[in-house]
Structure formats: C-alpha cells, structure tokens
C-alpha cells in the first residue's frame, strides 16, 4: 500500500483499486486507465461546540466528489441561543445512491453530547443532555453520553463499507462508539470533547450544546473517463471549545473501482 500524508492508495492493478482522502482539504484526482466506473463514499465533518461567552461552535465542512456526491457537515452548537448543532445531510445526483444523516448534538439544558456520524443505511445517534447516548443505525456512529456537567464526543464512521452500528456512550460520560469500524468519540477534558473519525460531533461542557455529526452519502456506478481530473473535497471538523478541545472530526472521501464492487457492502474493503 502506498501512503502519503493526505491520502491512501492501494490496489493490485489499475483495473482494481481504491483511494481514500482523510485530511481536510481540496484535491485533484486523476482517473486511472482503464477505469470507466467508480463507487464513492463521502462523510462530512462533525460540528464543534461554543467557546464559552466568546463564539459559536463552527459547522463541519461538506465533503464531495466532483458534482456527483456531497455529504454535509454537522452543525456547530450556538453560544447565544443555546441551540444544538444539526446533523449533517447530503445530496447525490448520479448512480445507485444511499447514506444516512448525522445525529444532532445534545441540547444546552445540560451539557450536550456530540451526535454520531451518519451510517450507510441509517442515521447517527442523536446527542443527549444527560445519561447514556443513543446508538447509531445502519452502520452509523453512536452519540456520546453526558453526565449533565460534561458531554462526550460522538462516534465516527468508517470508510470500508457498512458494518456494525456504534453504541451510545455511557453517562460517565464516554464517547459514542464508532460505526462501521470508525473511531469512538473522545471523553471530555473539561473544555470539551473531540468527535470520533470520521465525522463525529464534539461534546460540550458548562451547560452548552453539542455539535452535530456529519452526514454520509455514497453513489455507485458513477461514470468517469480515464485521464480526467476530478475535484475531491474533504470537509474539516468544526472547531470549538476552549483551546479547540471541542472540535468535530474531519470528514473523508473514499473511491473504489473494479468489477462487482459497490457500497454499502459488496467487496468494499481494500483489494
């Protein structure tokens, strides 16, 4: 496997392979010969939490593959209104499509936990104000738990196809479980909790709301032309919390090609 700071590329030949972009930014991907059809999954970045008495949490960024697939980022929590971050959604305009929305963050009536990232066939778990978090569905991430004083981060979602959904975090609090082999959300440092990769929303503290999880969208049988260059955008996690301790996880984009490979789960692992 070839690895570079911003993406991971593997495959036995140009007719079968995959590439994953996992660092926030904009990339140019050249379609390899003789590839004429690909499947793509995009995950939006998770939303951040407020900096107390200073600013709102930032929204997570959208992730996209050309103009074909877009997964929206989770919303940042609002400092002035106390509104929780909304879960990310998304759009697809080509191919056999699917995906779920991110879970909304927990409200500010306690200290809201982060929402889980969307799954392949269901939504991420919604954040809570106090108590155990909610499990994700369809391979999505679970939301963090909340003690009522601090909320944990939402779980992210993996890129290798649909797997088990993430469990909700405990009221200790612990972060939501990652769905489809994604990463669990972070515990709370006292200044906030990080979302789990990819797309988990941040957990809050001091009576603030949590960030929303990023949405997931996939498309299959997307027609491409060898040698053409396609823009790939990976959305950043929304920053927030004191010293950025309450930042959502970044999004990601993964492209696969080869015979009989399609999301959510047909030969979607690395080949």
Q: Model regions: which residues?
A:
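Generic detection of intrinsically disordered/low-complexity segments and helix-coil linkers/edges
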Residues: 1-2, 15, 23, 114, ...
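Low-complexity, glycine/proline-biased repetitive segments and flexible coils/loops
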Residues: 6-7, 37-271
């Amino acid at each position: 496997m070839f690895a570079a700071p911003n993406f991971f590329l593997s495959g036995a030949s140009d007719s079968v392979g995959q590439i994953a972009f996992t660092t926030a930014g904009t990339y140019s991907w050249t379609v390899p010969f003789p590839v004429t059809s690909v499947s793509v999954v995009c995950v939006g970045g998770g939303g951040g939490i407020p900096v107390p008495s200073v600013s709102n949490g930032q929204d997570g960024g959208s992730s996209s593959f050309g103009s074909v697939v877009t997964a929206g980022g989770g919303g940042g929590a609002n400092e002035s209104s106390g509104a929780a971050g909304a879960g990310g959604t998304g759009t697809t305009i080509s191919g056999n499509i699917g995906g779920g929305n991110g879970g909304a963050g927990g409200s500010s009536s306690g200290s809201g936990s982060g929402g889980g990232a969307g799954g392949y066939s269901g939504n991420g778990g919604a954040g809570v104000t106090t108590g155990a978090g909610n499990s994700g569905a369809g391979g999505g991430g679970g939301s963090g738990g909340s003690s009522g004083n601090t909320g944990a981060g939402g779980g992210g979602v993996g890129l290798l196809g649909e797997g088990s959904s993430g469990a909700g975090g405990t009221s200790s609090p612990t972060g939501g479980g990652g769905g489809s082999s994604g990463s669990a959300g972070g515990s709370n440092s006292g200044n906030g909790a990080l979302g789990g990769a990819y797309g988990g929303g941040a957990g809050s503290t001091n009576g603030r709301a949590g960030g929303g999880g990023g949405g997931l969208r996939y498309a299959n049988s997307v027609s491409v032309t060898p040698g053409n260059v396609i823009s790939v955008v990976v959305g950043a996690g929304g920053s927030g919390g004191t010293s950025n301790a309450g930042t959502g996880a970044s999004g990601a984009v993964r492209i696969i090609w080869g015979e009989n490979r399609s999301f959510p789960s047909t030969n979607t692992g690395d080949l």
